[in-house]
Amino acid sequence: MSLQSDSGGDELSPPPITKDQVLRLGDERFHPDNVAVVTGAASGIGRATAIALAVNGLTVVGLDVDEAGLDDTVETVESLDADGRAVAAAADLTDDAETEAAVEAAAEEGQIRYLANIAGMQHISPISEFPMEAYDDMTDVMVRAPFLLSKLVMPHVRATDDGVGAVGNMSSVHGRYATRDKATYITAKHALNGLTRSIAAEGEGTLRGFSVSAGYVLTPLMADQIADTAEKRDITEEAVIKDVMLGQARTEELMMPVEVANLFVFGFSSHAKHLNGGDLLFDGGYTKTYE
């Protein structure tokens, strides 16, 4: 597993993304006149997905509250000499007006065909101690915002010349099974799976809905979770990675954000035209095998 530190210390972070790591597909709709809206684009999987889609030629409008992180994403796309481009649209996904304004701004950049609902949050706590404020924040970002964004984006897709497009939702292995101390995250991911199927049911075949369920991915969210879990269970961070996160997996390494981003590239492409209501499960055997 290739890891590095952001600042020369012990903090885990993925290596910088290069063009060679990106799945590149010659899709006729992957060009700068078509827009992909990507949430959580300031870091982690959202940033990697924004970069990968821009490398494939799309105009990507990245949404996040982290303006500095969005600027870094845009600069990375420019440094890679991508065939497409990235545009920052700072927005608080818990604010309907800001979310609506961000979609309107995206529509000014071209035809919106794709939406990647990736923004996420985590809080580690048992149900009996879970703060409802954290529950509200997490479900606002990971359930309500994807629903609202889908509601706003779907008419734009239908207004294109052929009505072809897709909404990709970032689910998780926790959308398939449950572990302790993550009840709200698990609830949200199960809800996203329901939204995915509902989009497929209403998309009339050309507007698809799909989800991506990854195992443990090395993101800032995951790095924080490692520390929180170690504290909650009174074990080392190394034990969290080896035993808690990868203990059931057959591919015994954390995924990198760009590996997940490549699944969104495929899911949005014409190669995935029969991926509708379905889920791309890439978990290293975590949920489908046992000792």
Language-model segment annotations:
Residues S2-F30, Y177, V265, S270-H271, ...:
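Short C-terminal tail/terminal secondary-structure segment
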Residues L58-D72:
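Conserved glycine-rich Rossmann-like NAD(P)H-binding loop of the short-chain dehydrogenase/reductase
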Residues P126-I127, P131-T139, M245:
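Substrate-binding pocket helix/loop in short-chain dehydrogenase/reductase
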Residues S128, Y177-T184, E252, S270:
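Active-site loop immediately N-terminal to the catalytic Tyr-X3-Lys motif
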Residues S150, A188:
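Active-site helix of classical SDR
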Residues S172:
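Residue(s) in the substrate-gating loop at a strand-loop-helix junction
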Residues E204-R208, L275-G277:
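Short, small/polar-rich loop/turn modules that mediate ligand/substrate recognition or access, typified
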